[in-house]
Amino acid sequence: MSKTIVRKNESIDDALRRFKRAVSKTGTLQEVRKREFYEKPSVRRKKKSEAARKRKY
């Protein structure tokens, strides 16, 4: 879990920007979106192989 403490004389916008950067760096939002709905293992394998095929070509 990302945590950001607002520094002295720091605007909320700057603190929010630091928080967003920390969240994107850890991949938290992507993980939440990925796990929003249950995905059957067969579908997960199919997506994984399609992604590998897409990377190859």
UniProtKB/Swiss-Prot annotation:
Which InterPro entries is this protein grouped with?
A: Ribosomal_bS21, Ribosomal_bS21_CS, Ribosomal_bS21_sf
Molecular function (GO) terms listed? Answer: structural constituent of ribosome
Cellular component terms (Gene Ontology)? ribonucleoprotein complex; ribosome
One GO BP on record is: translation
Matching entries from Pfam families are given as: Ribosomal_S21
Keywords (alphabetical) are:
Ribonucleoprotein, Ribosomal protein
Q: Which family does it belong to?
A: Belongs to the bacterial ribosomal protein bS21 family.
Any idea what this protein is called? Small ribosomal subunit protein bS21
Per the UniProt record, the source organism is Geobacillus sp. (strain WCH70)
